[in-house]
From Swiss-Prot:
One Pfam family per UniProt: UPF0102
Gene3D superfamilies linked: 3.40.1350.10
Protein name from the UniProt record: UPF0102 protein Tlet_0667
Organism: Pseudothermotoga lettingae (strain ATCC BAA-301 / DSM 14385 / NBRC 107922 / TMO) (Thermotoga lettingae)
NCBIfam families linked to this entry: PRK14677.1
HAMAP family tied to this protein: UPF0102
InterPro entries: Restrct_endonuc-II-like (IPR011335), tRNA_endonuc-like_dom_sf (IPR011856), UPF0102_YraN-like (IPR003509)
GO molecular function, one term: nucleic acid binding
Native organism taxonomy: Bacteria, Thermotogati, Thermotogota, Thermotogae, Thermotogales
Stated family: Belongs to the UPF0102 family.
Length: 107
């Protein structure tokens, strides 16, 4: 499965769970955020990783990647007129076995 298919599956999964998708592939000078969503008044910045289940794709989300997502998220926040309670960073792993959603990733 390619990255585009993985992001589409992740978007469908989030919508099914009640998330409202605000943007996909949001690009900044700091990097790209795969999915930006709203859930229960919070902004959720989602990194999507795909691959096989033998090598867990989520392990490719390291400290540097999270920092880049935080910088890109701050860029989005500075440029949005939406109000929100707060934000978090999630990781969604898409493999042939299914989808795993890791919420509120911390560094």
């Amino acid at each position: 499965m390619n990255w585009k298919e993985a992001e589409e599956k992740a978007s469908r999964y989030l919508r099914h769970k009640g998330f409202k998708i605000l943007a996909r592939n949001y690009r900044t000078r700091f990097g790209e955020i795969d999915i930006i969503a709203r859930y229960r008044g919070y902004l959720v910045f989602v990194e999507v990783k795909s691959g096989n289940s033998f090598f867990l794709p989520r392990t490719r989300v390291d400290l540097q990647k999270i920092r880049h997502i935080q910088l890109a998220a701050n860029d989005y926040i500075m440029n949005t007129k939406d109000s929100f309670k707060g934000y978090r960073i999630d990781v969604i792993e898409v493999t042939e076995k299914g989808i795993e959603h890791f919420e509120d990733i911390q560094i």
